């Protein structure tokens, strides 16, 4: 039977117990959320635009509201990784899964983001490959989360001929939610495309950015929705 514990509501405490037991049984570290930030590194994203993505993420992990959200994930915290995606077979893990247990870890993660370089400038935009590779990363890491989320950002639709529908359905079958950040730069109707063809799963959503200059605001808002406390 679950009882109220100081600092954690009864619902949250029950969720805590439900999360910890299976994770430990699998030899994995329990976390509230496993999150992959999947960044568009296709040819449509120039050097300045790519840098704005990186800077936006770094700023978000130093933002007081995001730091508070991370602290509210205690005692388990979050596991977060960053990948760059482009064409099929080109996805690159640039920051492996990192255990973010509190604000200090979040700030350190944000600093590491500033050191990340661009690994590719792919010729095509394969959302299908980015999602499939991110899902595989979620399945193979050393953490077990109450929620598993791919946070995919991009400035255009899939143009690689890959099976985007299969990729998102396979992710859903593995218990993964896909959220989107549509960067409304040159592609009209991209947000509607993300709503219909990209996001999937429980509480999935898409956050629009009005160009790359708006990415920092959009990723912060997105993280605040994703980094919600245990049991909520």
Where are these regions (language model features)?
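Von Willebrand factor A/integrin I-like adhesion domains
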Residues: 183-231
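N-terminal signal peptide c-region/cleavage motif recognized by signal peptidases
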Residues: 20-22
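Von Willebrand factor
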Residues: 29-96, 100, 104-153, 180-190, ...
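VWA/integrin I-like adhesion module and closely mimicked acidic/polar interface patches used
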Residues: 70, 156-197
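Exposed acidic/Ser/Thr-rich ligand/metal-binding surfaces
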Residues: 118, 122-174, 224, 228, ...
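Second-shell loop/turn segments in exported
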Residues: 38-48, 80, 96-99, 113-124, ...
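Bacterial N-terminal signal peptides that target proteins for export
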Residues: 1-13
């Amino acid at each position: 039977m679950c009882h109220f514990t100081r600092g954690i509501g009864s619902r949250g405490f029950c969720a805590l117990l439900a999360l910890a037991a299976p994770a430990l049984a699998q030899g994995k570290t329990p976390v509230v959320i496993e999150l992959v930030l999947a960044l568009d590194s296709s040819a449509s994203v120039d050097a300045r635009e790519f840098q704005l993505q990186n800077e936006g993420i770094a700023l978000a992990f130093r933002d007081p509201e995001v730091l508070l959200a991370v602290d509210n994930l205690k005692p388990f915290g979050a596991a977060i990784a960053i990948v760059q995606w482009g064409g099929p077979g080109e996805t690159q893990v640039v920051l492996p899964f990192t255990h973010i247990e509190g604000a200090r870890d979040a700030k350190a993660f944000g600093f590491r983001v500033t050191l990340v370089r661009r690994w590719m400038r792919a010729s095509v935009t394969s959302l299908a490959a980015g999602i499939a590779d991110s899902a595989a990363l979620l399945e193979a890491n050393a953490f077990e989360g109450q929620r598993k989320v791919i946070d995919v950002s991009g400035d255009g639709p899939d143009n690689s001929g890959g099976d985007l529908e299969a990729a998102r359905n396979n992710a859903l079958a593995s218990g993964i939610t896909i959220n989107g950040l549509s960067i409304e730069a040159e592609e009209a109707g991209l947000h509607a495309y993300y709503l219909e063809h990209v996001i999937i799963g429980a509480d999935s959503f898409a956050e629009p950015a009005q160009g790359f200059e708006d990415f920092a605001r959009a990723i912060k808002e997105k993280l605040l929705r994703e980094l919600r406390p245990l049991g909520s």
